Amino acid sequence: MKTLNFCLFLVIISSLTVRVFCLNDRFLTVNDNYVICLYINKSFVNCENLCKAYMNAKDGFCRQPHCFCTDVE
């Protein structure tokens, strides 16, 4: 029983820590708008400025380690 509980504990912890939206840069559609998901494996990245400067997007938000650029033209 202890082994089963330990295995269940490991599965729950791994499912919480391994959530990844995208491993590579890819386009997504959210409410009929194109959104690009950038994989940025660095801390302290300003996603809003990155999206506006390099992706010609109107806005961007961060969900580490990803930047989501919205309204990409």
UniProtKB/Swiss-Prot annotation:
Keyword Nucleotide-binding (UniProt): no
Gene Ontology CC terms: extracellular region
Subcellular localization: Secreted
Transmembrane segments: none
GO terms of molecular function: ion channel inhibitor activity; sodium channel regulator activity; toxin activity
Location of the LCN-type CS-alpha/beta domain: 24-73
Keywords: Disulfide bond, Ion channel impairing toxin, Neurotoxin, Secreted, Signal, Toxin, Voltage-gated sodium channel impairing toxin
InterPro entries named among the record's database cross-references: LCN-type_CS_alpha_beta_dom (IPR044062), Scorpion_toxin-like_sf (IPR036574)
Tissue expression notes: Expressed by the venom gland.
Role noted for this protein: Putative sodium channel toxin.
Domain notes: Has the structural arrangement of an alpha-helix connected to antiparallel beta-sheets by disulfide bonds (CS-alpha/beta).
Family label: Belongs to the long (3 C-C) scorpion toxin superfamily. Sodium channel inhibitor family.
Descriptive protein name: Putative sodium channel toxin Ts39
Species assigned in the record: Tityus serrulatus (Brazilian scorpion)
Highest classification ranks of the organism: Eukaryota, Metazoa, Ecdysozoa, Arthropoda, Chelicerata
